[in-house]
Amino acid sequence: MNYEARPDASDSAQCAAGMSDKVAANPLDSDFIAEMTRIFRNAWVPVCHESELPEPYDFRTTSIGNENVIICRAPDGKINALLNVCPHRGMLIERRPQGSFLEGQASGNPKRITCMFHAWQFDMRGNCVYVAREKEGYQERFSKDDAGLRRLRCTVNYGGFVWVNMNDQPVSMLEEWAGPAFGHVEQQLNSVHLEVVHYHKEYVEHGYMTEALEFLSAAKHGSLFDFGHCAINANGDN
């Protein structure tokens, strides 16, 4: 199927008003950087549901924009969001999609988040608790207190969903950011017990029917709780 997109008068008007007429594909593209900065670094993003972390030391990994994030439950039951990057050499720490730190990793101790590069270890709040050869290699020039994982703004609300904001000083808190539009949704979400019971991934060989499936199928846009809203990607990812 060949289709040539031709800009019409409305497209020209939008471009004239300052809207870009191209898709940002290069990570260094100014539009892409603006999107990461103005949207993903300032919005409250739902990353998972609290039921996915039922026990202390349970974790999930995800990404917000182009940043890798660990969501984990601390021993006191609090859910924390941490940047999934070691402050030592910028290594991606946890590559598994989910699991538990209770038993420890191959290169670390139980109940620790461990970077496999140099075995630096962190607790569930992101505090650095172990540095290999700390005294021999750093003497008094270094303190673990200054080497923790970056903690992100994190809260649980609206039916138990975990929301994260990449901005250390958010422009607004979640409730203010959500605004009146969330009033009806909040009532629905909080009126029933929500729990993630399994994960489902669906591969689509071709994406030519994506638009019809996404906008016309009753199963996609029925009751919020009767049907699951599945994201469909033209590349066949979901």
PLM regions and their residue ranges:
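A generic alpha-helix preference that emphasizes hydrophobic side chains
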Residues: 32, 83, 151, 208-209
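A generic alpha-helix structural signal
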Residues: 36, 83, 212-215
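Residues at helix-coil transition
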Residues: 40-41, 88, 216-217
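Generic structural signal for secondary-structure transition and capping sites
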Residues: 43-44, 91, 220
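Small-side-chain structural scaffolding
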Residues: 46-48, 81, 206
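Rieske [2Fe-2S] iron-sulfur-binding domain
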Residues: 52-168, 172-174, 179-180
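C-terminal catalytic domain of Rieske-type non-heme iron oxygenases
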Residues: 73, 78, 156-238
